[in-house]
Regions:
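N-terminal basic/disordered segments at the start of proteins
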Residues: 2-4, 8-48
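Solvent-exposed alpha-helices and their adjacent loops that cap or buttress functional pockets
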Residues: 9-15, 58, 81-83
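Conserved active-site and cofactor/substrate-binding residues in soluble primary-metabolism enzymes
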Residues: 14, 27-31, 68-75, 83
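Conserved acidic residues
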Residues: 17, 63, 86
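Short active-site-proximal "capping" loops at secondary-structure junctions
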Residues: 27, 49-53, 72-73, 95-96
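Short glycine-/acidic-enriched loop or helix-start segments at secondary-structure transitions
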Residues: 31-32, 55, 99-101
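N-terminal beta-loop-helix "entrance" segment that forms/cooperates
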Residues: 47-69
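N-terminal glycine-rich phosphate/adenylate-binding segment common to multiple enzyme folds
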Residues: 73-101
Length: 101
């Protein structure tokens, strides 16, 4: 029996479809990338300036990493479209002060 990726995924989840990781601070985005890679699931990075760990940003080829500031929703949406990701997941903290500026 295959090891489940996550019990929270829908039954029709497509492992061949790309997932965009919206990466905040900390270890969670790094752990998520490692988990997706271990299952061979393609993924792209949506990094936030001064939030996403540099080592995570550098772990992606330039064609699979995108960056924006926290408040740049339009740019984030353009980046998501450019990445051609079918799914998106947020992992890691965003500095609260930056959310309300």
């Amino acid at each position: 029996m295959d090891t489940p990726i996550s019990k929270f995924l829908p039954p029709d989840f497509d492992k061949s479809a790309k997932i965009a990781i919206l990466a905040g601070k900390g270890e969670y985005p790094i752990m998520l990338k490692k988990r997706l890679d271990s299952f061979g699931i393609p993924n792209a990075l949506m990094a936030f300036e001064d939030e996403t760990p540099p080592e995570l940003f550098n772990a992606y080829p330039s064609s699979e990493r995108y960056s924006s500031n926290v408040g740049q929703l339009g740019k984030l949406l353009k980046n998501l479209k450019a990445s051609r990701a079918k799914y998106a997941i947020m992992a890691g903290q965003i500095t609260p002060k930056k959310l309300f500026r």
